[in-house]
Amino acid sequence: MTQTSATTTLPTLRRRATLRRSLGLLADFRFEQSDPDRFYGHLAADTVSILSDIWADAGPTTSAGRASLAGTRILDVGGGPGYFGQAFAAAGVDNYVTCEPDVGEMAAAGIRLASSVRGSGMDLPFADEAFDLTYSSNVAEHVSDPWRMADEMLRVTRPGGLMVYSYTCWLGPFGGHETGLWQHYVGGGFAARRYEKTHGHPPKNRWGESLFNVSCADGLQYAQTLQDRGDAELVASFPRYHPSWAWWMTKVPGLREVGVSNLVLVLRKR
């Protein structure tokens, strides 16, 4: 299986991916349910920084030098309640669209975005090649067919544009989401039942309904299939939350499933 090293192809992002950043994101994880503004606000700002660096390193070269997100047509698939839209606006990006299927999720934080479109990632309501950059952040593990969603994202990405696909790997410590760090290793059903017994209500992410087993190998194989078909080029694959000196984990079968936690695939459409 062919893999591209992010350490050589994404130098700007590599410099940003420090241990301090990783520890800060890790510290925020415990606030996902109790203080979503803090958790998702910081995550959204970090996501904008990641995409800005990826676009600078792997996007089109302009007469002014490296590409900027300003003026770039961006689609966020599964953008949720608006934290990401706010972060893009704060960064000066005004050509951002988010597509979210759940009305309740869209309104959860009380954030109103004129650029929000209700629709399914499995059947995106956009024309072919409509966007320069499409991305999905922590959505793939919540849909029953993540690779159909990825195909849809690639469809609406223009040739030469980028698709960034980031998702939580099931066998990583956060694969079970709010159900705990180890319970999902026993099984998704067990983790959900134990959570409900402990907290008196079922988890937000329900095993087999809105939470699924997606592996690192699944994503890397998908990227390889796209390359073999000539549909896209794998620009890079790396662990989203790790410092750059730990990005080598994506190359080691077995270890990557438990050590990567969240895999990022950067694909350039051909």
Question: Where are each of the predicted segments found?
Answer:
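Adenine-nucleotide cofactor-binding loop residues
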Residues: 122, 140, 171
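Conserved N-terminal segment of class I S-adenosyl-L-methionine
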Residues: 1-123, 135, 259-264
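Short, flexible loop/turn elements at secondary-structure junctions
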Residues: 103, 138-139, 241
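S-adenosyl-L-methionine-dependent methyltransferase catalytic module, highlighting the catalytic core
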Residues: 144-152, 158, 162-266
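Acidic-residue sensor for enzyme active/binding pockets
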Residues: 100, 141, 152
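A short SAM/SAH-binding and catalytic strip from SAM-dependent methyltransferases
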Residues: 133-144
